[in-house]
């Protein structure tokens, strides 16, 4: 116990416990991996890991030249860590800094994950160190967080070693297992601030229809999700769908900027 042992940092203040709570896990201990550096000249310890461990590999017997394809798991690619369902236990234990692995992830990933964990921490604080709602209500809330976290990039989830598990869990699929995928549709060509309307050019996907879930991302805009409704074409006419190669306008609740990218969000089957 930090308080009982009076463990203090350089400034004489009690140190704060931090923990990695969510996101991609490296197969190596303490980041001591040189696969990327040795094979591609990109050092993981300088933030440039090419993650070649995430690929599929053949295992070859040196003596007999027998080859085996490991096709049911990616044996060097762990599932992503997720702790939100037992976050109250970690906070009760004294953790005060939560680390989220978000390197090279999209703005929608950062927004979603940070929002979920912030909501969980605020709920715990509201109850003065306990969940302030009943068991059924907190189970429903955790299920909601799990659903939202599953919609952004992930390789499947596990608890890590926090709850006593000794063997790691490996992903069964290359790339993301998110329940939704984003498909690039086009870019913002203009924004009319006085009426909060954004104009876009549909350059990639076949069509956008009324009711479609959309995502807008940009350096300053961050990540903004909306549902396509009241779609107007370049002539100002109301449409239920827009075809590739057309300009269209949507009313937005947030400021959108020229050059921002718009994506169509599709349920992954």
Language-model segment annotations:
Residues 1-269:
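Surface-exposed amphipathic alpha-helical tracts and adjacent flexible/coil segments at the periphery
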């Amino acid at each position: 116990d930090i308080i009982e042992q009076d463990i203090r940092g350089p400034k004489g203040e009690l140190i704060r416990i931090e923990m990695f709570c969510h996101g991609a896990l490296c197969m190596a201990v303490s980041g001591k991996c040189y696969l990327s550096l040795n094979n591609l000249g990109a050092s993981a310890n300088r933030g440039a890991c090419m993650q070649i461990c995430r690929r599929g590999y053949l295992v070859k017997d040196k003596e007999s030249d027998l080859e085996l394809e490991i096709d049911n798991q990616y044996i060097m690619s762990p599932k992503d860590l997720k702790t939100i369902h037992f976050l109250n236990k970690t906070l009760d234990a004294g953790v005060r800094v939560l680390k989220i692995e978000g390197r090279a992830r999209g703005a929608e990933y950062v927004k979603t994950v940070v929002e979920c964990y912030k909501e969980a921490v605020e709920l715990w604080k509201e109850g003065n160190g306990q969940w302030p709602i009943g068991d059924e209500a907190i189970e429903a809330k955790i299920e909601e967080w799990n659903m939202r976290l599953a919609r952004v990039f992930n390789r499947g989830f596990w608890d890590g070693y926090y709850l006593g598990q000794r063997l790691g869990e490996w992903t069964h699929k290359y790339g993301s297992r998110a329940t939704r995928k984003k498909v690039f549709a086009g870019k913002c060509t203009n924004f009319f601030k006085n009426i909060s309307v954004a104009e876009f050019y549909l350059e990639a996907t076949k069509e956008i229809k009324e009711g479609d879930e959309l995502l807008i991302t940009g350096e300053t805009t961050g990540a903004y999700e909306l549902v396509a409704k009241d779609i107007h074409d370049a002539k100002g006419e109301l449409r239920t769908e827009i075809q590739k190669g057309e300009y269209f306008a949507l009313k937005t609740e947030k400021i959108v900027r020229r050059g921002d990218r718009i994506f169509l969000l599709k349920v992954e089957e």
